[in-house]
């Protein structure tokens, strides 16, 4: 789970202001942070099935947002992929 301060930093970095939480880039960045945290958790707790299920849901949700973004604006898609270091 992301702390409030880290969440605010991500929102400000990708959304421009702390109030701009609905932007696709912000949502993708927050999901990426959650996914990274869950991945680290699962490396230690291999049999934690509920967390694994939640991880897969979050990956799918991020994929849908990335698909939406590539349809709307390819340049924004390329920027977010480069910033977060995601594969295509």
From Swiss-Prot:
Q: Is rRNA-binding among this UniProt entry's keywords?
A: yes
Q: Does the record carry RNA-binding as a key word?
A: yes
InterPro entries per UniProt: Ribosomal_uS15 (IPR000589), Ribosomal_uS15_bac-type (IPR005290), uS15_NS1_RNA-bd_sf (IPR009068)
Annotated Gene Ontology cellular components are: cytosolic small ribosomal subunit
Q: Which GO terms describe its biological process?
A: translation
> Which SUPFAM superfamilies does this chain map to?
S15/NS1 RNA-binding domain
What would be an example GO MF term here?
structural constituent of ribosome
Source domain of life: Bacteria
Give the record's keywords alphabetically.
Ribonucleoprotein, Ribosomal protein, RNA-binding, rRNA-binding
State its role: One of the primary rRNA binding proteins, it binds directly to 16S rRNA where it helps nucleate assembly of the platform of the 30S subunit by binding and bridging several RNA helices of the 16S rRNA.
Q: Which family does it belong to?
A: Belongs to the universal ribosomal protein uS15 family.
Oligomeric form and interacting partners: Part of the 30S ribosomal subunit. Forms a bridge to the 50S subunit in the 70S ribosome, contacting the 23S rRNA.
- This protein is called what? Small ribosomal subunit protein uS15
């Amino acid at each position: 789970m992301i702390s409030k301060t880290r969440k605010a930093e991500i929102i400000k970095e990708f959304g421009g202001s702390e109030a701009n939480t609905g932007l696709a880039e912000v949502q993708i960045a927050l999901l990426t942070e959650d996914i990274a945290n869950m991945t680290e958790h699962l490396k230690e707790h291999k049999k934690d099935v509920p967390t694994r299920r939640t991880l897969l849901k979050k990956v799918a949700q991020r994929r849908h947002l990335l698909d939406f973004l590539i349809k709307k604006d390819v340049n924004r898609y390329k920027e977010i992929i480069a910033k977060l270091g995601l594969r295509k």
